Amino acid sequence: MEIGQYQPNLEGDGLRIGIVQSRFNEPVCNGLADACVEELERLGVSGEDVLLVSVPGALEIPLALQKLAESGQFDALIALGAVIRGETYHFELVSNESGAGITRIGLDFNLPIANAVLTTENDEQAVARMTEKGRDAARVAVEMANLTMALDQLGDDEDEEEDEEDEEERA
């Protein structure tokens, strides 16, 4: 049996990407953003198609993502932040709530969101992971934007077939 399969597409040309970056643990978040933007450019996303906004901390990321999603101007969004256990007593709350909010926005708006909010035990772990996680967020956003657009076309193709069948029945 032969089955259809969608191949991952990392071509970023023409995609519009919104990035929300936390300023808490700023050196790590700047490292995430630098790596992310560099990778978006490498994948063909134009600088004029990227909007980067910053928020005070990880708990503010979901609201900013929601506003970007509501605008309808983006093919994918990216969340960048760093929650480090050693620096906050409410590590679990911030980690869990920001993650749940990011996921909810993506599902509510049917919009891919690459979540690169690092949750680490210490600064050293965050610094060690920031570059690769920033790059990975860019790749996830581009791949998922392309995938969701391709899957949306499946529905469009089915609608066109139904319209053609309806026209044939009326004729």
Swiss-Prot record:
The record's section on InterPro entries has: LS, LS/RS, LS/RS_sf
Which UniProt key words apply to this protein? Riboflavin biosynthesis, Transferase
Q: Name one GO molecular function term.
A: 6,7-dimethyl-8-ribityllumazine synthase activity
Residue ranges with Acidic residues bias: 154-171
The reaction(s) annotated as catalysed by this protein in its Swiss-Prot or TrEMBL entry are:
(2S)-2-hydroxy-3-oxobutyl phosphate + 5-amino-6-(D-ribitylamino)uracil = 6,7-dimethyl-8-(1-D-ribityl)lumazine + phosphate + 2 H2O + H(+)
Q: Which residues bind 5-amino-6-(D-ribitylamino)uracil?
A: F24, A58, L59, E60, A82, V83, I84, N115
Q: What are the EC numbers?
A: 2.5.1.78
Indicate whether Cell inner membrane appears among the record's keywords. no
Q: Spell out the GO cellular component terms annotated for this protein, sorted alphabetically and separated by semicolons.
A: cytosol; riboflavin synthase complex
**Annotated GO biological process:** riboflavin biosynthetic process
Pathway connected to this protein: Cofactor biosynthesis; riboflavin biosynthesis; riboflavin from 2-hydroxy-3-oxobutyl phosphate and 5-amino-6-(D-ribitylamino)uracil: step 1/2
Query: Which residues take part in binding (2S)-2-hydroxy-3-oxobutyl phosphate?
Result: E87, T88, R129
Highest rank taxon of the organism: Bacteria
Broadest EC class assigned to this enzyme: transferase
Q: Which residues form the active site?
A: H90 (proton donor)
Q: Where is this region: Disordered?
A: 150-171
Q: Which family does it belong to?
A: Belongs to the DMRL synthase family.
Q: What does this protein do?
A: Catalyzes the formation of 6,7-dimethyl-8-ribityllumazine by condensation of 5-amino-6-(D-ribitylamino)uracil with 3,4-dihydroxy-2-butanone 4-phosphate. This is the penultimate step in the biosynthesis of riboflavin.
Q: Which NCBIfam families match?
A: lumazine-synth
What this protein is called in its record is 6,7-dimethyl-8-ribityllumazine synthase
The organism's taxonomic lineage, starting at the top: Bacteria, Pseudomonadati, Pseudomonadota, Betaproteobacteria, Burkholderiales
